[in-house]
Amino acid sequence: MAPGVHPFDIPVLRDGLSFELTRPVTFLVGENGSGKSTLLEGLAWSVGFGAHGGNRDHQFTEATDGHALGRALRLGWRQRTTDGFFLRAETFYNFASHLEEAGSNFSRYGGASFMAKSHGEAFLALFEHRFEDGFYILDEPEAALSPQRQLAFLRILHQLTAPRIAQFVIATHSPILLAFPGATVLSLDDGSIREVEYRDTSHYQLTRDFLLAPERYFRYLFDDADGDAPGAV
């Protein structure tokens, strides 16, 4: 590692980090910029997936941050696997375009091109038809999923992990996904990586408090905005 050089200047990476994946599902939470996506890119590169998404067969232009961190990571395995997938919501279009250009047989993905589906439909088709045993790294999958489809994803997650045939590491802001039973939740805030309880996350607490009393939040947000407006008394 080169201290002070990006991405090793990210607080959670500055002094090195070590963690274990002891359960089938591990969630990473933290504010934007805390290092979640960079850590996932590094994991993906270390496993052999493209740092922009896909599996070992889908190598696109590498992301510098993920490449640098991936070279520094040292992974220990109980049973090493190269099967799996790295899903990034923001670059999923690149993966779908790659399949189109390669003339892929979409029977492996539910029978229809991803380009003929909505973003959320394409995600679920990938989850249902291509996720089996292996190591899966997902970066904010909720970005393309409505609340109802997030529930559908949780069902797929249960089907894959109940027999312990798959391992998932998922970065998310979704309190719905974070509620998955038996998952480990790791926070990357405050410059360290530590396990937290689902109900202790700001994602859960803020969503719960807002839904219970939205008017209180509107008063706080809008009164400040009105006070800053030109001509406000």
Regions found by a protein language model. Name each.
Residues L13-R23, H129-F131, A162:
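Phosphate-binding P-loop
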